[in-house]
Amino acid sequence: MLLTAATTATNSFAGAPGSNANQNTLILYDSTGQWGWLGEDYGIMAANLVSHGSKYTVHAAANYVAGEINGYTGLVYVGSTYDEPLPTALLDDVLATTKPVLWMGDNIWQLSARATNFATQYGFTPMFFDFTNTLTVTYKGVALQRNALAVSSGLLQTVINDSTKAQAIAVATNDVGGTVNWATKGANLTYIGEVPFSYTGPNDRYLAAIDLLGTVSNPTMLARKRALVRIEDVSADDSPTQLRAIADYLYSKNVPFTVAVIPFYVDPNGYYNNGVPVSLHLRQVSGVVNALKYMQSKGGTLIMHGYTHQYSNVANPYSGVSADDFEFYRAHINSSNYVVYDTPVAEDSMSWTQGRIQKGLLEFSNAGFQAPTIFEPPHYAASAIDYQVFNASFTARYDRGLYATGWCPNGVCGTGTPNYTQIYGQFFPYLVRDIYGTVVIPEQLGNVELVEFNNNPPRFPADILLSAQNNTVIKDSVMSFFFHPYLDISYLKQIVQGLQSMGYTFVPANTVKQG
């Protein structure tokens, strides 16, 4: 039987390793109306991020009880439903507390209406929704992006009444030079004029929200400058020469690194071999095995990147070949050239997933390697069942999360039925413990891609370094990217040197995993 923090009947969760044991955050979200399901999603996204700083409890705001805030060191409310009927006890307790409160999006007007004199207490007043084309949010002097698709939701504008009590800590700028307060802080209350969890990207205002969540979850958070690099999609089909060259370079720059290994390479239909099927066990290719051992000697840590990193003998969605396709999730490419996530694979079950994990671990053993302790799901996609298996089989994941609506009714994760027609991904800039109970090593900067694919633009070292610069707004952010070994090593050198010149020190993934 698998028993994890995600499957016990509670809405209270442990923080990530290194979180502040003296901190405990209450996270509340909206749950009524047509978009009530979205409230749960946003609450879970906030909760995942809060785990870096503290343990937490997450549940619907409607279930708040008087005095509940007294058991916590801070409160986060995510307002996604216009005029959600918030309990009077919640409004009164927020107005009475001196603990840090972060309020996002809707219903701040309920709080101001309940106050005796909101402007006197906090130094600002919530006003009206601004629907101008605000596409930039400046926070800590860094200009972050705001997707045009978010504009139609509006930004709740504030007015500063007393600059000795309140200030705009982030300002949005529209396309004609007008400005709107994006985040306002007065006394112990910080207010963000939207829920910045939709239409996010690597340079998005989401980064500012992450940092503001950290000020509530752990006001004494460390400000380390650490970096991670992962060498991606390494299998028996790779070039030992390229792998050794990468190891030599990284070692010369005092850069520990991770190698994401696919232990069993298959091309079931001979897609890259003139129609002749190929299957290569790691142990069968001594050149790659020796190169991996060489990489270990130069500071490399091997992790498991799926078993075959593909599914059956079908295009899922590309070729059916290892490293190309999804393994634990079905996907197709639509007529607009977007990858569409369909459902978990037909065989999806704990026993099926455990079987693949065990086969993968056996491949490592047969090739003379110790069992990896860290797992990376292929294409960062799996079912809730799979994530529970990964949690039981490894000490951490190294990825971005994929979550489904319905898994966490009232914050009690694992008691609901995941709705795979409503899935959402989330990237993290630092170590978290997500709602599956798993310690998640971050990867948020992406990778070098020389050409556009599936409507994703090319991504060069300069793009990755720009995202890293934007991530500096987040206290304790880990600059984490990955690199495919078939690319010219000059791209890797540019990123490593760029991050080091920014003052970041590369560390092993296992160091970040410890907190």
Where are these regions (language model features)?
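Catalytic beta-strand/loop cores that center a nucleophilic Ser/Cys/Thr
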Residues: 133-188
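A glycine-rich, often tryptophan-bearing local segment used as a flexible ligand/cofactor-contacting loop or short
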Residues: 77, 81-148
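C-terminal domain-boundary segment and adjacent tail
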Residues: 58, 213-223, 241, 245-268, ...
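Non-catalytic propeptide/linker segments at domain boundaries
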Residues: 173-226
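Metal-dependent polysaccharide deacetylase catalytic core of the NodB/CE4 family, i.e.
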Residues: 109, 256, 260-385, 445, ...
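Catalytic grooves of carbohydrate-active enzymes
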Residues: 226-236, 240, 351-354, 358-374, ...
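Aromatic-Pro/Gly-enriched surface loop or interdomain linker
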Residues: 13-71, 223, 250, 259
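Acidic-and-aromatic substrate-binding clefts and catalytic sites of carbohydrate-active enzymes
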Residues: 34-38, 61-67, 79-86, 109-110, ...
